[in-house]
């Protein structure tokens, strides 16, 4: 067909069925949304693992186990089937994002700085929404999604920062005194949004998640050994190892679902839904760690919902 596919009755297939150069599958979009639910357990489980194994060793163990699980249950295609452009650019972006987030949290000097760095990292849903709008070829798409993006981003700040007692004056001082973790978190957020929006078109439908994930594990082991940190003084308990497995399954499973979703589902829908990631993550962490959810959290969650609905309405109005 020269200009668009036709269905059995000869009627042209609707343009809305295509996104990012592929035919959108509702099933794939749903699978992509499952990633957001799985990732909600990431922060809490990683925190528990880090308390028992240390930050760098804990991350390396999680991604090693996650990589093994992916290779067992979702083996990657043979290397020769991967487009070289996707393999190089996609692989570098994936590994850089994961490594930069791990490093940025490790370099944060205080608990308050860790919260601030996490907030910078959570700019990726906003970046992803704006990039998705920018490549959609719809007139004034970026301007139209901007109000919803601003509202949702303000909600993320309230959800994550407000629930942790974020002090903006102190945050500015922390950035001035130790800018590297914040710069890494920002660069990582940008890298992940670029990966999600642009690499599906390079992949020709081949998902590299199961191949990229073990590469992250290698990078994290290098970071661990370079940091000079060794094994914990006391052997971690069986429960600690169980949380390594849970974190690995949640993170690895999340990336597997996300990879399938961005390749075959609706990028715009997934981008908008990704605003829920920090909200669900903060909520799940509070449950796992026995923390209370303050009023700013609920106000932020409401703003995220409002901003997401605004962007959904814009995207639905083709």
Residue ranges and their predicted role:
Residues 1-62, 149, 154-157, 165-201, ...:
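Glycine-/small-residue-enriched transmembrane alpha-helix faces in small-molecule transporters
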Residues 2-22, 59-63, 240, 274-318:
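C-terminal-most transmembrane helix of multi-pass membrane proteins
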Residues 38-45, 75-121, 158, 247-265:
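Specific transmembrane alpha-helical segments of multi-pass solute transporters/efflux pumps
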Residues 43-44, 67-71, 125-134, 166-230, ...:
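Transmembrane alpha-helical segments that form core, pore/gating elements
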Residues 48-65, 106-124, 174-189, 237-251, ...:
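Structural signature of hydrophobic alpha-helical transmembrane segments
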Residues 49, 58, 104, 134-137, ...:
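Hydrophobic/aromatic residues within transmembrane alpha-helices
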Residues 57-68, 103-139, 267-286:
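Specific alpha-helical transmembrane segments that line the substrate/conduction pathway
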Residues 64-65, 70, 89, 94, ...:
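Hydrophobic transmembrane alpha-helices of multi-pass small-molecule transport proteins
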């Amino acid at each position: 067909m020269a200009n668009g596919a036709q269905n059995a009755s000869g009627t042209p297939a609707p343009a809305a069925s295509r996104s990012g150069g592929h035919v959108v599958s509702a099933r794939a979009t749903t699978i992509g949304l499952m990633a957001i639910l799985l990732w909600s357990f990431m922060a809490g489980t990683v925190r528990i693992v880090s308390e028992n194994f240390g930050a760098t060793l804990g991350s390396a163990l999680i991604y090693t186990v996650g990589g093994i699980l992916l290779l067992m249950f979702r083996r990657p295609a043979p290397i020769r089937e991967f487009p070289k452009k996707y393999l190089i650019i996609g692989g570098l972006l994936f590994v850089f994002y994961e490594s930069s987030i791990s490093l940025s949290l490790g370099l944060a000097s205080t608990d308050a700085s860790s919260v601030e760095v996490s907030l910078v990292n959570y700019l990726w849903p906003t970046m992803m929404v704006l990039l998705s709008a920018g490549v959609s070829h719809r007139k004034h798409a970026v301007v139209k999604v901007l109000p919803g993006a601003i509202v949702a981003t303000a909600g993320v700040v309230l959800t994550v920062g407000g629930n942790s007692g974020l002090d903006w004056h102190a945050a500015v001082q922390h950035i001035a005194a130790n800018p590297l973790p914040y710069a890494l978190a920002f660069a990582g957020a940008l890298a992940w949004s670029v990966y999600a929006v642009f690499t599906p078109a390079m992949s020709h439908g081949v998902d590299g998640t199961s191949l990229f994930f073990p590469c992250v594990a290698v990078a994290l082991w290098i970071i661990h050994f370079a940091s000079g940190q060794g094994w914990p003084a006391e052997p971690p308990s069986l429960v600690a190892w169980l949380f390594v497995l849970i974190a690995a399954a949640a993170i690895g499973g999340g990336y597997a679902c996300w990879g399938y979703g961005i390749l075959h589902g609706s990028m715009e829908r997934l981008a908008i839904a990704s605003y829920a990631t920090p909200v669900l993550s903060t909520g799940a962490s509070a449950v796992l760690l026995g923390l209370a959810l303050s009023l700013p959290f609920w106000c932020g969650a409401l703003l995220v919902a409002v901003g997401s609905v605004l962007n959904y309405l814009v995207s639905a109005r083709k």
